Curated annotation (Swiss-Prot):
Lineage: superkingdom: Bacteria
Record-stated family: Belongs to the lyase 1 family. Argininosuccinate lyase subfamily.
Transmembrane segments: none
Gene: argH
Catalytic function, reaction form: 2-(N(omega)-L-arginino)succinate = fumarate + L-arginine
Lineage: Bacteria, Bacillati, Actinomycetota, Actinomycetes, Mycobacteriales
Name used for this protein in its record: Argininosuccinate lyase
Protein location: Cytoplasm
Length: 470
């Protein structure tokens, strides 16, 4: 049987909790990351208690000095949780009482509950974590834009259904991975509008009768506002679910980029060579160079999705207000952040060091009759309805396949036999360079549009960095 010595609760109980309950309730193994935020919030709470007339100036200063000492010891690792500590809050109160005594240390608990306390600390931690993750995503975007800028005219096979479709610029394809990552960062920046609301002062669920000032503590802690509803403030974790969704979406977007790298690095594709420092070998096959970073990105995306779904399952069907189920809200989010902080620098390094075989990509770009659409559109420009033009281009492909030649190698008579408008001049559009250059509307793969797009992506990344620092 455990005791309640040092616990934040217990007066109503004759005995401490059973050992199995104490073990089940324990959370210091994961919530200790909140300790620095708890110390900062406790300082703000001490000042609010003083302004409410619940502490003398001497008591306030004594608490602040004790919290300063405790914060320093937490930062350098000389103070940490004991086996007997239930959670980060109890451990820190124990540390404060060790420094200032039980009479003064016990005064800090006035007007706050672990319910509003942990909801506030979780938001503080997550707002900082989101900025770190966003910075990491922008590093990957930076690697993509640098590679795009280094290959402004390289042509590659564009694919749908993993089948050769139309020629595109390599830079266009790389930027297609940058855009969703920028949207992820935009979501993280927008997330802060909803996360920047302070639950402090909500108490267990009903607010406080002690004349506290939730707006003052919200401002001191860097929140935009205090919560309007104390029940919602202590019981809601939609902010955590929102962040977990964006983290999982980042994982999905990185996984799609990773899949391209994996395919491109195969012998069959041969588009890229992996840098030695960003790949691994085989324990038995000496020739192997494995895309482990990309494969781990695929694997971790599943983990991130699992964290999101696990959190949502925890949140569903809880009655208002706070329930102990919410002890399970933090580990999935903490883990998602930890995984992304491992993955993002590795992905940025992988992308930045890819060596592209642009000759190989250019050689493969026209294969599979990828210029058939150009034939159809050439006919449309000559007044042929697209349905008819599509049929004619398909017939030209069938004829070329039957002879084992390219579209440009069909005889004039063969072209005319397919459609009277298919004259020898159609060969003018049967080059990958001409195909790419012709797609010069906004969003297209023409070099002029891709150059504009590259500048816009870089501008967007710079603006997102500024938003994240506000």
């Amino acid at each position: 049987m455990s005791t309640n010595e040092g616990s934040l609760w217990g007066g109503r109980f004759a005995d401490g909790p059973a050992d199995a309950l104490a073990a089940l309730s324990k959370s210091t193994h994961f919530d200790w990351v909140l300790a620095p935020y708890d110390v900062v919030a406790s300082k703000a709470h001490a000042r609010v208690l003083f302004r409410a007339g619940l502490l003398t100036e001497e008591q306030r200063d004594g608490l602040l000095a004790g919290l300063d000492s405790l914060g320093s010891d937490v930062a350098d690792g000389s103070f940490g949780p004991l086996v007997s500590d239930e959670d980060v809050h109890g451990a820190l109160e124990r540390g404060l009482i060790d420094r200032v005594g039980p009479e003064l240390g016990g005064r800090l608990r006035a007007g706050r509950s672990r319910n509003d306390q942990v909801a506030t600390l979780f938001r503080l931690w997550l707002r900082d974590a989101v900025r770190r993750v966003a910075d990491g995503v922008l590093e990957v975007v930076g690697a993509l834009t640098t590679q795009a800028a280094a290959h402004p005219t390289a042509i590659m096979p564009g694919k749908t259904h993993l089948q050769s479709a139309q020629p595109v610029l390599l830079a266009h394809h790389l930027l297609a991975h940058a855009h969703p990552l920028l949207r992820d960062v935009d979501r993280l920046a927008d997330f802060d509008k909803r996360a920047a609301v302070s639950p402090y002062g909500s108490g267990a669920l009903a607010g406080s009768s002690l004349g506290l000032d939730p707006d003052a503590i919200a401002e001191e802690l860097g929140f935009a506002a205090a919560a309007d509803n104390s029940i919602d403030a202590t019981a809601s974790r939609d902010f955590a679910a929102e962040a977990a969704f964006v983290f999982s979406m980042i994982g999905v977007d990185l996984s799609r980029l990773a899949e391209d790298v994996i395919l491109w690095s195969t012998t069959e594709f041969g588009y890229v060579e992996l840098h030695d420092a960003w790949s691994t070998g085989s324990s038995i096959m000496p020739q192997k160079k494995n895309p482990d970073i990309a494969e781990l990105a695929r694997g971790k995306s599943g983990r991130l999705i699992g964290n999101l779904t696990g959190l949502l399952a925890t949140l569903k069907a809880q009655p208002l207000a706070y329930n102990r189920d919410l002890q399970e809200d933090k580990e999935p989010v903490f883990d998602s952040v930890a995984q992304l902080e491992l993955l993002l620098p590795a992905m940025a390094g992988l992308v930045a060091t890819l060596r592209f075989d642009v000759d190989r990509m250019a050689e493969l770009a026209p294969l599979g009759y990828t210029l058939a659409t150009d034939v159809a559109e050439w006919l449309v420009r000559r007044g042929v309805p697209f349905r008819v033009a599509h049929e004619a281009a398909g017939a030209a492909v069938r004829a070329a396949e039957a002879r084992g030649v390219g579209l440009e190698e069909l005889e004039d008579a063969e072209l005319a036999g397919i459609h009277p408008e298919l004259t020898a001049e159609v060969r003018d559009v049967l080059s990958t360079e001409g195909s790419v250059n012709s797609r010069d509307a906004r969003g297209g793969t023409a070099p002029i549009q891709v150059a504009r797009q590259l500048g816009a992506v870089r501008d967007t990344a710079d603006e997102l960095r500024r938003r994240l620092r506000r």
